[in-house]
């Protein structure tokens, strides 16, 4: 522990990092009982502190801190650590290591704002949720170069250790930062980067000057500029965090050889791409979508073809769309500037935005199912056109690729049909893939920008990744995250084991090493090894027919019961189903495997991917080039190194990335940081125990403690152990001789009764198992208690012995004295003794005389010295009196200062309290505002959802209308076909038999081909399995090249053979399938034509019936609409009448208010005149009280302003709330209307579906009949002649039916014309209705405007009243001379207030009268229908007025926009000038850098030139050597010539040799020429290389120039961010200066009060006079207080009046409810009329009882249901039931018709035997039954029409009640405003009361100061008197002695 002086270097951060010395000493001296102080388990708090009271039978009874007594088991009790371990910095050093000790240590440190704590190798950080001063530059420099144990825990300490290890060990480092979302991972990552950037740039002070212009914060600035881009595309709002990173990242910061920053790069992991298409309710998608739609850049909206409403796009509007803490507009500008800074080109920027917009459009693409097919088709192409345009694709190709993708089968491509759901899944997968690939591409581009190309040697990696996740629903994403954390924990355990091993090895400890990294091996192998979860998942993904169930079954077969980590979860109520559980180190997690196969495959539509690759957008094509390459590689090589590269699953890719990460981490020295969320509510200082414990388990802190406990976690140096625990057995260590500390510790531990296996001796330390040190501490405490007791006993014995010894000595001395006295008494009468007594004094007389003389001399001397001393004493006394006087004066002054200081402190405390109260109020108001905003957001979301549903319903209605039109067209077509088909009927009868035979034969052949196809598929599957095995063998046998070649040749031969077989099989199957398809199509055509022939006639009859019904329904609808229009007109008249009455009332009230305002203004004028008269008197008073009132007045004003603002905010919020409630009610009405429309549509849909089903049944029956006819034709071929005659009869009947069909079609055409005419009339009525609704809306708007004017008048009145109260308060301070006048004026004002209140009450009574009139007008509403036209004219006038007002508003808006534009232009010019200045400064900096870099390049070029010159010199030397060789050859030539001259005799031989030598010379010359040419060529190449190098250097210079420009841009951006931060800092400094000014003002007040007190002490008489004046003022204030009290009572009276008005409003509400009741009675009368109509219907139905028994029963049930119904909703339901019964009756009738048809068929058979008459009778009976059915259906339609009419009546009544409720709400608003006035009056009274209290406190204070001054004067006077008395006494004593 360092001292407070050592901590001074941390500055203001010191108290947030380490305890002070005082706290440490207090903790060590705190009383503590190790046996009784424990933690016990608690169900609420997890663990609580307690004191053990008893232990019995394995149970412990303890008393908690809260006073509760609990009894728990022994294993739920945990011992507490001694107080010296409180707030310990490294939790691994605690005596007792367990969960509650860790929890409470973290909690106590967090309460003291020490957020960083070590736990062994971990650094645990708790999110403070507020700013702490622990990251400033002072702290950075303090941690620089410090070891871990030398400084308090901090993220800077971890960073500095990593940096120092990198420099000293020359090893890469890594910092692993994990934790849940919102725990502070990203913030700590930024702090790490900040630290490295600071120390690495300013690290080498010797070269500081040289590097000052190069890398000053460059890396940090670049990463900061990358952050907005990464956060925009990778961050989103979650439940816990508004800006949560939805991806992990590993940031590598590279350093050069000297430790300077070199470059950086980023790797990302596990981007949550599912968020692109799906979000939870409380979350939202990635920020970029909402930034674009914030409309900060309108050109983006136009470019992307989108709107600014997120609810228009399904992918981004499933959750919330706004975040209060994020400004999307500012974030968009930051993102846009980051794109520029990071060097993206303009095309790339546009591509990024376009791809983002395309993803949004993908979510709006609609598809529907084709009729009679499962094939999907586009439902509109508008959205697809936009998406394709943004991606530079062809819209038709895109839609075709989505609905009809091409699939490769063998070597051919086949078009495959897609269902609607499959298409939607494909669209979602494409959107996610585009977004993910774009994000990864942006990361790659950022890395290219961050790579500065500087030399780098080592790096420090910072891993920011999500922690362990255990949710209620855990899917594949959670398994990946948890598996990552499992691997990281294994890595930590192994690393910790290695460190422990090194420690034990260094200390020479014998220990059985356990690799704790293997503890997690079982779980990891279960997931990643062969036949593990991932392996099985990937295997299942390869099988086409695999499902989630088959995957689950395989998991169970493979692992259930075989692995302890794999379990089957127990079903829990209320939770999502779980399929299997895994036992992780952090707990057991239940996983749900739904959709894992699809997630893992993550299939993409390959056809669309092909379109992407061919896109004209380069970025999109580049993003998907890798996909094509992978396919080519997978398809072409078939046996490369990367197996299955064309089919890489998500899990395989994840494992590959994870393995790379683990490889990186294993190559580094790791440091671990764990981030903790203290609570879910983001409250600073609060900690939730269960939440923190869950995180400690999940992030491995408790796992690390477990590993510590397995070894020897506690370790102490021998010297420290000997010194502390020697007391346990001091005899074990011999005294008086030297002994080594290690031997002493061994002897000491050997002599103590402890388990000797629980400790080990190292070279320098003794190591203990967990808990043993605590046991030694307890033994030491017991031993110390014994020793202290023994010491106390010895001390008490020693003191008793000393006392006894004194008593014995006293007794002996007494005995001696008694003996001597007795002896003297015996000898005093002896004569010799008497002589001795007489002589003895005479012997000393001479000596006494001498002594007397000496004494006289001494007396004289002392007398002189006394006189001198007396003189000195007098002087000193005088000085003392003067000093005492000064002392008293100083004491009085100090006392006065202390009093004034106390007063100032009291005032300061009061100010702080008021500030806290105001802050609390502000917080409450902001919370309320946030709640209201949340409610508003929910309502708007609901509104959007309803609008979407409404639009969907409209689309459904449009679709139904389209289908109806299609059906009508088909009907016309089929009418033409019927004629043709009747002619072809005879021919088709003959061909049917042949076709059926052919069909059977084809079916058999089709079955045979299916069997063959299945066999071929089995073969293909076996072949694919064999192929995969062979590919595995190829991958495994890469070691030897020769074997691989042989195996590859064999495999290729087998593959070619198999492919040939496969092609043949596929070709044969394709041929068979084509034949089969052709035959099926022919067969379907024939069957379809046959079924059409039989069914079209019946369809046409049913259609004619339906059209007749529709005509009747539309006629009824027209009547109903006419009735509705009449009712609407009546309600309009009523509403207009009410509006005119209300407007008259508002005008009267406004006139009254103006009168009151005139009175108050006249009163104000009088007050101003009086003010002018009293100006002089008031100045004198203000000068006297200015200094005392200044601070109070400012505070009052601030308080009043803040209260007024809060009140206004509350009023605004209430108004917003009321508006929202109105909108809510209107939305509810719309919901009801939509629900009713939905019901009608669903009923119509159900009817259509029933009709379809019946038609299908009829078709099937006709098919069966067709087969029977076929058999009859085959059986009765002999009777063909007779049948021909019968066929003539049938043809006649067919002609009759044709004529009937033509008649029906003509009737249908007439009906369609009528329908169109009715539709046109209906549209006209709807238009008229909408015009009326618009008029009503405008009238409401006028009413709202009038209401707002009224509110403004009310506010003006309140302002006047506040001014009046201020004038009253000023008048009250005037002299008593004018008090009576002021009182009279206030009384007059009060009378005016009373009059105003009376007028308001009259107005309220008038409102009541108006409501009564409304009730009477309700009864006479029929008479007011004639006034509708006049009201419509008024409405038009009001509309014109509104239009004029709107025009004025638009003009004003235009002027405002122009001024805004001017402001923006001037602001832009200012920014441009600032930018210019910055660019000039940066250009200067750039030129300097360029100059330095050019100098460096010049030096490098010089060095390269030297090297080239050296090479040239070498070449010239070689040429010189060649010249020497030539010279030597010339010498040889000369010698040969000499020999020639000498040997002329042998001329021929010499000539031959000469020729030979010349040949040699020629060859040598040739060689020399070749050498020369080679040298020339090399020189030319070198010249070219030099030129190439020059060009390369020029390019490098250009690239460096571009990077320098990018750096300058990033630096400018950083400067901008820095300026922004400086602006924030300036604001904070302004706040600080404001606080300092407040303190300085308080100090000035204190000094002023000091001066005032000095004046009062100097002038007591003036103070007395001032006291009298203050008494007079007090009397005046009391009178004013009485007046205010009377005013408060009057305000209470007005409050009671408002209460009465509220009751009146409630009475009006009751009247409205009575009116509703009256309407209800009218409704019941209508119901009675409806019942009468229904009885008529039942009578008509009664006529059919003999024909249809079921219809009569249904009608009786309907009667019973109608009579039993009590409520309107039940009657509607019963009516629906009756309609359903009638529908069933219709079905029954249709069934009877079918039965009759069957009988008719039988009759036809009988007719063969001669029964034609019977057939005719049956046909007549059938026609009668059909007519009856038709009449019954008509009656049913009429009943439904009446039911709908009553439903509309109910809606009208509900609408009327809603209008009444709105009127009540308006009255309630009026009451609320009156209450607000009352509150303002109360507030004024409170302000006056506060002012009186302040004056009273000032008076009391001055009176108290006066009394104290009098007391001090009395005390001083008494002290002076005492001193005088004393001086007199001394003087008298001196005189008497003289």
Curated annotation (Swiss-Prot):
Residues 845-1926 form a coiled coil. The keyword Phosphoprotein applies. It is found in: Cytoplasm, Myofibril. InterPro entries: IQ_motif_EF-hand-BS, Kinesin_motor_dom_sf, Myosin_head_motor_dom-like, Myosin_N, Myosin_S1_N, Myosin_tail, P-loop_NTPase, XRCC4-like_C. One of its GO terms (cellular component) is muscle myosin complex. SMART domains: IQ, MYSc. Pfam families: Myosin_head, Myosin_N, Myosin_tail_1. The rodlike tail sequence is highly repetitive, showing cycles of a 28-residue repeat pattern composed of 4 heptapeptides, characteristic for alpha-helical coiled coils. Belongs to the TRAFAC class myosin-kinesin ATPase superfamily. Myosin family. Muscle contraction. Muscle myosin is a hexameric protein that consists of 2 heavy chain subunits (MHC), 2 alkali light chain subunits (MLC) and 2 regulatory light chain subunits (MLC-2). This is Myosin-4. It comes from Oryctolagus cuniculus.
